[in-house]
């Protein structure tokens, strides 16, 4: 662990900033403050939070978040700084597997007429689809950041968009086959249509339909490479296996009680950035204003259970050109082809990488099963959708995310002022502050870091280059 700075010890603190959590929010904050005297405490034995992947030769197995933004995104700047590379996803990202058929090409507006649906189901699909398109366009408008606008203003608009009704209520009564399709897509955010706002549901589709909003790239080598590389550059300033049990703000410093391998120790800092899930922040940070504590406690998280599958095909396969398929009625609600980003002109390497996950109610059911039972259920349904996979499976990894995604529930906008308020020397960061994704988490972490930097500058704290370390 990096020793405290002599200059900061003279000021009665060990560090300028303690960052709690080494997910992408915490690491983005640490990267922003890499010239300052900082320390990052992460309770797990690895960095990255919900960004988990495992390398497998030419491929990788993804077990968590995997969608990166384009060149104007904050994630893209972090990727560039880390010397890594993302590539645009070439395949269809809105496929559907319904009643034994797959439709994964062409305009989504044609799907109701190409899927094996009854006339009543087709009509229901068209009516609900038109309502969804209208709401998605509204989401696209309000989600765009205006010139000179604070990120907090965008967050307030996004969480407030159509948050007075549920997604299910907005779509209205649907044919059962159509309801199952929208349920599968809603479960992508780990909740059911009646649990999320109409705006949250619209946002799921807006991010797929709008190229300016879409997170439509994959990190070459797997998502975990980004947090791993940032942590490697930050070196001993990132401490894993370090569980922060208490954060106590005081007038001129913040005390942090952390459990390390040698026992519980206390550290202090000018600022603490709590880059932890909302419920963890609520548990560890003391003396929060009552409305902020209540808001953190009321952020709902849904589960998902993920399966990553390494395949061993020797040549091209029918799904090479497809990236994502929604799979209503299966043990999982989404199927991804993470080798799709590698498919294009030139030689196709043998093998492949698939990922499935079940969120929302599907995730809750899966959490009650053993890993072996989950694997059997996943493979059975993969074979029913992609029969050619049978006999090609080389490895399966199951991962459980009990608190996966902080979905937007009705009335969410009423919590936002309490989450955005200034809390003195404690700063909040995380994807729960807006529509949950990696970009939001990274932006929130960097924003918190810049606020801490401004505070340190006002206090006249020296730069890292001006310090003499013991």
Question: What are these model-derived regions, one by one?
Answer:
Residues 2-12, 335-470:
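Conserved flavin/dinucleotide-binding core of flavoenzymes
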Residues 15-40:
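N-terminal Rossmann-like FAD-binding beta1-loop-alpha1 element of flavoenzymes
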């Amino acid at each position: 662990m990096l020793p405290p700075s002599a200059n900061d010890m003279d000021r009665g603190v060990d560090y300028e900033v303690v960052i709690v959590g080494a997910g992408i929010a915490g690491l983005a904050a640490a990267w922003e403050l890499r010239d300052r005297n900082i320390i990052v405490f992460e309770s797990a034995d690895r960095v990255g939070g919900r960004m988990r992947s495992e390398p497998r030769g030419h491929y990788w197995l993804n077990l968590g978040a995997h969608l990166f933004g384009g060149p104007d995104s904050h994630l893209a700047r972090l990727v560039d700084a880390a010397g890594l590379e993302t590539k645009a996803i070439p395949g269809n990202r809105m496929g559907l597997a319904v009643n034994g058929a797959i439709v994964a090409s062409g305009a989504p507006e044609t799907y109701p007429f190409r899927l094996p649906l009854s006339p009543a189901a087709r009509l229901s699909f068209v009516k609900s689809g038109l309502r969804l398109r209208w709401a998605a366009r509204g989401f696209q408008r309000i989600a765009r950041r205006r010139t000179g606008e604070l990120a907090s203003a965008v967050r307030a608009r996004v969480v407030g968009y159509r948050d007075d009704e549920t997604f299910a209520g907005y779509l209205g009564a649907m044919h059962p086959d159509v309801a199952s399709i929208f349920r599968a897509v809603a479960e992508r955010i780990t909740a059911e249509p009646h649990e999320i706002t109409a705006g949250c549901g619209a946002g799921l589709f807006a991010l797929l339909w709008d190229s300016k909003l879409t997170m439509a790239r994959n990190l070459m080598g797997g998502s975990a490479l980004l947090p791993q590389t940032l942590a490697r550059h930050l070196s001993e300033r990132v401490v894993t296996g370090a569980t922060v049990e208490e954060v106590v703000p005081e007038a001129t410093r913040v005390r942090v009680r952390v459990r390390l391998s040698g026992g519980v120790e206390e550290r202090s800092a000018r600022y603490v950035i709590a880059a932890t899930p909302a419920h963890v922040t609520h548990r560890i940070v003391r003396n929060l204003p009552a409305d902020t504590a209540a808001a953190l406690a009321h952020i709902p998280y849904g589960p998902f259970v993920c399966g990553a599958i390494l395949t061993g095909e020797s040549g091209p396969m029918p799904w090479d050109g497809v990236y994502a398929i929604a799979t209503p009625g299966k043990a999982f609600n989404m199927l991804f082809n993470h080798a799709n980003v590698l498919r294009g002109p030139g030689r196709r390497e043998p093998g492949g990488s698939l990922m499935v996950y079940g969120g929302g109610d599907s995730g809750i059911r899966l959490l009650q099963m053993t890993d072996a039972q989950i694997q059997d259920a996943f493979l059975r349904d993969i074979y029913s959708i992609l029969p050619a996979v049978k006999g090609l499976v080389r490895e399966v990894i199951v991962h459980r995310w009990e608190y996966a995604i902080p979905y937007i529930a009705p009335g969410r906008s009423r919590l936002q002022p309490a989450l955005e308020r200034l809390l003195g020397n404690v700063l909040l960061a995380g994807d729960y502050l807006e529509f949950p994704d990696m970009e939001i988490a990274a932006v929130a972490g960097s924003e918190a870091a810049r606020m801490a930097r401004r505070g340190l500058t006002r206090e006249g704290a020296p730069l890292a280059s001006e310090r003499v370390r013991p």
